[in-house]
Amino acid sequence: MKLTTVLALSLMLTASAFSQSTSSELKELKDAIAAQQQQIQQLQQQVQSRDSAIQQLQQQVGQAQSAANQAQSTAQSALGGEKKEGAMSAEEFAGLQHEVTDLKAVTANTVDGLQDTQKRVSDLESPLALHFKGITLTPGGFIAAETVWRPHATFSDINTPLNSIPFSGAAQARFSEFYGSGRQSRLSMLAQGKWGTTNLAGYFETDFLGVGTTSNNNQSNSYVMRQRQIWGQAGFHNGWTVTGGQMWSLVTETKKGLDNRTEATPLQIDAQYTAGFSWARQYGFRVTKNWHNKVWLGMSVENAQTLLTASGNPTNFLIGGPGTGAGLYNLNANYSSNASPDYVLKVAFEPGFGHYEVFGIASDFRTRIYPNATLAKPTAAGAFNNSIWGGGFGGNARWLFYQKHFETGIHYLGGKGIGRYGNSGLPDVTVDPNGYQKALPANQVLASLEWHSPKWDFYGYGGGEYVGRTWYGTKPGGLGPVGYGSPLFNNTGCGTETLPTASNGYGPGALANCTGQTKSVVEGTTGFWYKPYNGPKGRLQIGMQYSYLVRTAWVGYGPLVTVNPPPANPGSATLAPKAIENMWFTSFRYYLP
C-alpha cells in the first residue's frame, strides 16, 4: 500500500513538472511569435506611412494647383471686368497676383518634392546603376541557351557562314547538323561621368564566340571570351561628340541620330545576322555633330582589310601575309598591308517622321607587283607598289507606325570594293593577269518588318548580296582564264561527291573541278520573341527563328580551257551551282535588368 502511494505521488509530481515545462516552452514560443508579428506590423506601418506621405504630397499638389487656378481665374476676372463700386482696388489686385505667384511656386516645389521622393523610393527598391568615385556604372548583357539545326552541315555553331554553305556535291551537304550553345551570352558595362559640361562615357561588351587553341566539343566545351566593343566617348554641350575604340562601323544603320549603342541590328538568333545587312565591328575614330536632334553629320576613319578572291592567276603580286608568331595577330588568318584606313561619311535626318541616312565609303587597296615573276627566269627585280581606290554609296530609312508597334526599314549599299561590309563576306577585289587589283562591283539590300508589344516581338527580313565578275581570257603563258566569275572556269564537279581525305573520320573530301565563285546570296528570315517576364528583376525571353538561304555561283564551264584563244562562247554546257539551307534556331535568354 505504501509502495503504491509512493508511485502515485511520483507520477503526479512528474506530470506536474512536465506540465510546467511544457507551459513554459509554449509561453516562450508565443512570445517569439508575438515579437515577430510586432516587427511585421512595424514594417507594414513604415510602408503605409511612406505611401501615406506620397498620397499627401499628391493631394497637396492637387490642392495647390486648384488654388492657383482659382486665384488666376479671379485675377483675370478682376482685370477684365468693369470698375464698379466695391470692385477690387489696384493694391488688392496686386496682392492677389502675388498670391497666385506664391501658389505656383509652392505647387512647383511640391511637384519637385513628390518626384524626388518617388525617384528615391524607386532607386532604393530597384537601383538601375552602381555609383563609384563620381561615375555611374551600368552593367548589362544576357545569358543565352540556344540551338541550331541545318539540313546541310557547316560545322559553324550558332553563326552561319553564308558564303560557305555547301554545294550538293560536298560530303557535308549529305547530312544534317544540330548544335547547342551558350556562347552568344553577352556581358557589358557602361561607365558615365561629367567633366564640367562635357559628358564622358566608356563602353565594353563581350561574348564567348571566340575560339582558343584547345577549344572543342569533346567534354568541357570551353570557348573563350572575345572583344565585341570597347570604346571611349566625349560629348560636348555644343552638339559635337568624339568616340574612339572598337565599335560598330559608321556604315551600320542606327535608330537615333548617329549615336553609339542605337544600332539597328536584326532581332534574329543567328549570330551572323542576315544577308543584305551591311556592318563591321572594328577600330574607328568618329566625330559627329548634332543640330537640334534633327540633323547629324558624322565622319570616321576605320580599320581597313582587303578580301581577295582570284582563280587562275600567277604568283606575281602580294597584298599582305599571315599573322606572325611574335605579333598579336592570328597565325591562321591573312592580313592585308593597308596604305591607309577606310573613310566613312554619313548624314542622318529625323524631320519628325522616320529616320533617314545617306553615307559613303572610300577604301585604298594596295598591291606589290612583280612584273618579272612570269619570265623564263623569274626575278623580283623591278617590283613596285600600286594602289587603287574603291568605295560606294548607301542609304537607310526606318519608320514607326501604329503607336510605335509596327517598324519597317529599308537598306541599300552599292559600289566597287565594298564586299567585306556585307554580311556574307564576299570579296572586295580580284586581280588581272599582270597582278593589278580590280575592285569588284557589289550591291547589298535588306528590307525589314518588325512588330513590338510588351510581351511579343515578331520580325521578318528579306535581303541579298551580289558581287559582279571581272575576268580575263588568258594569263601570262597563254593558258586559262584569270579573275573572278569567269564563264570559262570549271564547275562540272560541284555536284559530284568525293572521297574522304583522312582516316580518322573527320576529313570530308574537297570538291574537284568546282571553282564555284559566289554571284549572290539571298536570305529570307522570320521569327519571334516572347517575354513572359519583363520588369525590375530583368527579362526572360524565349525565341525561335527560321531562315531560308540560297547561295548561287557564277556560271562556269568545264573542263578547264587549255587553248589559246579560248572559245568566245562557252556553249550550252554552262553550270551555275546553287546551295540551299533551311535553318531553325531556338533561344532561351535571361537579360540583366
Residue ranges and their predicted role:
Residues 2-9:
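Sec-dependent signal peptide recognition
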Residues 15-19:
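Sec/Tat signal peptide C-region and signal peptidase I cleavage site
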Residues 20-156, 499, 506:
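N-terminal periplasmic/intermembrane-space "pro-region" immediately following the signal or transit peptide
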Residues 125-313, 337-355, 399-409, 414, ...:
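Outer membrane beta-barrel
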Residues 153-157, 214-223, 255-262, 309-335, ...:
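Outer-membrane beta-barrel translocator domains and adjoining extracellular loop/strand segments
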Residues 176-182, 222-224, 275-279, 335-340, ...:
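Short sequence motifs at beta-strands and strand-loop junctions characteristic
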Residues 578-593:
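Outer-membrane beta-barrel "beta-signal"
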